[in-house]
Amino acid sequence: MMKTIRKISYLLLVISILPILSSCNNEDDVVKIFTGKTWKMTFIAKEGSKEQYNFWGEQGMTSENAAYKNSMDALAKEGNFILNFEGGDLNGTAGGSFGGRASTTSVSGTWNANGESKRLDITVEGKPVDKDVYGKAFITGLQNAIRYGGDENNLYIYYKDGQTTKFLAFHPQ
């Protein structure tokens, strides 16, 4: 009888400790997500949509629209619309420096991201100006970043553009 009670007590103890041992951490490994790869932008969309946002006005996203065609040619070109993040963990947040290229200009600056809240702060150095419509939107997205989403295979940088929230979508190159 005592052995049975002891076994039940041990079993209850193990069961009560199990949730503590297996508790999960909902915080992202931000350094692993951002660093160690070149991120290539794939598109820009409005929050809640997976469709390319129309930055090209009334003519829209057609091959007849020279501005749209120029943007898509620039996007397809290797070395354009890329970001490289460097950094490490700094007391629960990650941060460091970044560099990259829009369409016709380079960008660089600093970044800081919180893995728990997903808050993202990006400071772009200088005042880069891109001649391409999509390049301008890329720079605006970095300058107005508010949070990030994704994982090691997809990165989304959300930003405010007036009253609208949009995001830059990236994939490792």
Q: Model-predicted segments: where are they?
A:
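C-terminal motif of bacterial Sec signal peptides marking the signal peptidase cleavage site
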Residues: 19-23
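Outer/extracellular conduits and scaffolds centered on Gram-negative outer-membrane beta-barrels
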Residues: 13-16
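Lipid interaction determinants
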Residues: 10, 24-173
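Bacterial N-terminal signal peptides that target proteins for export
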Residues: 1-11
